[in-house]
Amino acid sequence: MGALLKGCWLLIIVFLFFSVHSLPSLAVMDRVPLTVTLLQERLSAPVLKEGMTTINLANLVIDIRDENKELQEQFYQQIQGQINRAKQPLGLDFSNSLIQGNFIASRLGLPTPLTKVALATLLSPTEEQLLQQDENFLFDSDEPVFNVTVFRGPVKLQRTVFMGEVDFSKTFFLQIVEAMEAKFSRESNWVESRFARVAKFTKANFMGDVNFSQSQFLNKAIFRTAHFKSITNFHRSHFTAEAYFDQTKYDKTADFTRTFWEKEANFSQSQWRDRPLFSKSRFLSLLTFRNATFEKSGAFRSSYFNGVVSFQDVKLLDQVDFSNSTFTKNSYLSVSGLAFDSDKAKILGDRGVIGQAIYLPTLTGNETVLRNLVRNFRSLEQIADANQIEYKTEKLRFQQLKQKLNNISVIRLINLTWVADFLHTSFLALLLLLSQDGTNFSLVFGTGIIIFAYFGCLFWLIDRVRRLTPKPVIPSRYEIFCMVTSYIILTLSGVFNILQSASRPLLTLTAIALILVPLPLILVIELYRRGRYHDLMDSSYFLQDGSMRQLRLLITRLPVVPEFPLFRDRYTPISWQKRWNWLNYYDLSLNNLLKLGFNDWRVRDRELPAIISFLVWYQWGIGIFYITLLIWTLSRTIPGLNLLIYLK
């Protein structure tokens, strides 16, 4: 009994399976050949579909080839006459019909001149308002008139098969167009067509060339899962609302040049087997190619982007060109999961622009993407863009480390295993703030100016302003004026440089202030609190090598006077009597910071407060870090010094 029941269930399942898969063939078998008599019957008895009066021409075989001249003439004349005579909009339903021969829409619709005078007698105020959205609409009747074919009612082409050429050029659809699963066997012409309502071409199959150039979609355009097997042309088309081209396939060149997209343009999961051309187009909102595949080179040259451009999980087999394109502050190129699946796969763009535009949300899962992007720009010798990608990589790494520190467990906190992560995070934060990971020379230069000016002024202060009583040891007013003025000018120039070049200038200035101000300030306050009562009060703490005056590179020297007597005799203190002696303190600071100067400056080792010695060594240590950062940044930003170009 159980075996019998199983057998019955198996037969039912097999029956249902074949029933479902035979529905399309049954639908084809149900098609009835259209005759003149049947045409008249259908025209005399329109049906009500979705609230609209519709001429029912569904499930027919409509033979309007030149060999069937009588039916061809009657077909166009009677349908057009019925539409023209109707006071209310009439829809056309060709669903599941097979149309043989060329299909010419202008012989079916209502011929309408786009002038205010003509529309007032032909259409309702609502329809007239829709037509006025056309850019060719003329309010002045003295200008040349632009004529269109108007379909006032909905046009249904669901599963319609067109065996010949289709011509919907210069056609204005005032109601919805439904062409789901329609098949266009030969060329289809939609040049300068207008869609006032939703245009649905879901799962449409375009076997021949399709031309939507200069068309306007005033409502949603839905081409989801459509298949374009020949040349596709949307040149100069205008999409006012959302456009859905997701899961579409393009077997040959697709021309979307000079198109205008006011809302979202969705090309996710699309397949481009030939060249996609989007040059000189304008995208005011989201443009997504998520999970798309580009088998040939794509062009987005001279395009304008005002929203997110998503290349997430895209597979590139050839280059994509963004040269001369504009990315506004609201736009960026998201490349999370981007795969370079060929040696020819590249992203092209303007130097210093495309690297800035690229965006990735996280480091996790995108390490390979970032390496490929760096290799991509280095192979193109676009060092600034390669450095920008590496800078963004380190920013993402910093965010990852910071998040890791924020989620420290109690056990790790007690065991101090977080210290290494903390030091790594702090050092990385410093690199990002002071040099953008060695990619911004202007930022490093501005930082150096501030450090150089600060310590020059600090050394002048502790050396020249020693005490007020009983015998004052202070500089002249002229010297004070020169030093303060020069310090302000140098510091402001460094700050201005940072404000211009840093991504987060306030944080950068804060980091510099934390390095320069707290510790030296505490030590200077302590120095003046204690007072100075040692010998040699009338002599400078800083000595110069007077044996020669020349520009010197003194990387290996230490800031203390030599011990050997013959060498010590060459060093003399700064002369306070000369009016320009304040410049020596800047030379000292430059020497201590960059190991470069016009004199070899040292600090004396007799009658020297320990605080002053510490401050000199403190700047010397900062100088080691700074000169390393400077050389590293120069090696990454000057192409001739960047050997990594040649070492992939």
Located regions from the model:
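Terminal module of membrane-associated proteins
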Residues: 2-648
